[in-house]
């Protein structure tokens, strides 16, 4: 089992995932999950993690918590209120697929259909790339691949809407075309086709920095989306290669001391840069899933083990009242310059990072178990 066989002074990854999920579920009712009473990707990412926990443990309370959130916002006819001008609104729809599979309640399919309709009305670049939001015209962000990609593929498989496969392939190819940096192999956070944003490079339109979480959303998307394509689809091979190349590039910038990654990935030598938890978790998820699915070489277990140990040692703690805490999670962030990113607020148990942490731990668990720990 490679490097995961090494003796590690931490518990099972699933133990930590449950500790964090239980802490947040004990802190917030589904009505209170921030931003309260909204169909939003913050809750969506966290609840995707909670549903993975349900699948891993069989504990029904995890399923019921996610279901209660959906039932709070979806009425008897499958109606729900969501922002109709942004990709972010779609991501929480990922929870609808396991809810429907388990309950066969058609409300969840109707709600998914409403979210799916958004693809037909979103504004696009000249090449057909979705604007991230109407508030950010002509811009594609790496985040958008996760916000809209996995849902589209799952919906395509549920309803046999094969055109959605081509849609996601196009979106990913455009992001890669416009944001990949040939020198580092990393992807810039955003691209402005109009080149009007203050941060936009006057030649390429790219934002100037490699933001950890945005790259994390991207590699997690790839790791999840490969298996959603038809088995003989040519882009399975393309996405595997892209994932392999991105992980290879990301791992060059892993902090040697902690095993984690910096808020601005390639500038760990700057004193005001800092090790960020959510991006580190998303990289761990993508690496673990890549190993589990055979997309990545098992040699990456060394990288994974170092990150796992560093995350638990440096970014988690248990409070006096028994709450499990994950620290140094960057709050919601737009595209910008270096100073903007490194000055962003650092949160504890923010749902971005909580969801990423739980997803990473559940994906790590099979490797941990196979090592006999």
Swiss-Prot record:
GO terms for molecular function: unsaturated rhamnogalacturonyl hydrolase activity. GO terms for cellular component: cytoplasm. The keyword Cytoplasm applies. Pfam families: Glyco_hydro_88. Optimum pH is 4.0. Substrate binds at residues 40-41, 88, 132-136, 213-217, 333-334. It comes from the Bacteria. Catalyzes the hydrolysis of unsaturated rhamnogalacturonan disaccharide to yield unsaturated D-galacturonic acid and L-rhamnose. It cannot act on unsaturated glucuronyl hydrolase (UGL) substrates containing unsaturated D-glucuronic acid at the non-reducing terminus, although the active pockets of YesR and UGL are very similar. Monomer. This is Unsaturated rhamnogalacturonyl hydrolase YteR.
């Amino acid at each position: 089992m490679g490097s995961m066989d090494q003796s590690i002074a931490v518990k099972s990854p699933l133990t930590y995932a449950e500790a964090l999920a239980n802490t947040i579920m004990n802190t917030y009712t589904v009505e209170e999950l921030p931003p309260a009473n909204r169909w939003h990707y913050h809750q969506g990412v966290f609840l995707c993690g909670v549903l993975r926990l349900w699948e891993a443990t069989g504990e029904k309370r995890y399923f019921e918590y996610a279901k209660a959130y959906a039932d709070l916002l979806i009425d008897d006819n499958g109606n729900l209120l969501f922002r109709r001008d942004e990709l972010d609104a779609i991501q929480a729809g990922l929870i609808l697929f396991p809810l429907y599979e388990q309950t066969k309640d058609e409300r969840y399919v109707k709600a998914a259909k409403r979210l799916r309709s958004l693809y037909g009305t979103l504004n696009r670049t000249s090449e057909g790339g979705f604007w991230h939001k109407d508030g950010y015209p002509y811009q594609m962000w790496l985040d958008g691949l996760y916000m809209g990609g996995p849902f589209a593929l799952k919906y395509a498989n549920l309803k046999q809407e094969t055109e959605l496969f081509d849609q996601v392939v196009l979106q990913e190819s455009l992001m890669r075309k416009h944001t990949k940096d040939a020198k580092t192999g990393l992807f810039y956070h955003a691209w402005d086709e109009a080149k009007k944003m203050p941060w936009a490079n006057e030649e390429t339109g790219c934002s100037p920095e490699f933001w950890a979480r945005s790259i994390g959303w991207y590699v997690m998307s790839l790791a999840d989306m490969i298996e959603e394509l038809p088995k003989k689809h040519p882009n399975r091979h393309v996405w595997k290669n892209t994932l392999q190349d991105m992980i290879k590039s990301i791992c060059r910038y892993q902090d040697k001391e902690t095993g984690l990654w910096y808020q601005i990935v390639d500038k760990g030598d700057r004193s005001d840069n800092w090790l960020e938890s959510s991006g580190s978790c998303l990289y761990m998820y993508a690496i673990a899933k890549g190993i589990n699915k055979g997309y990545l070489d098992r040699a990456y277990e060394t990288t994974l083990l170092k990150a796992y140990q560093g995350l638990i040692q440096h970014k988690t703690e248990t409070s006096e009242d028994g709450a499990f805490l994950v620290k140094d999670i960057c709050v919601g962030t737009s595209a910008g310059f270096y100073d903007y990113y490194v000055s962003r607020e650092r949160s504890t148990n923010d749902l971005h990072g909580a969801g990423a942490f739980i997803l990473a731990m559940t994906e790590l668990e099979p490797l941990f178990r196979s090592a006999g720990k």
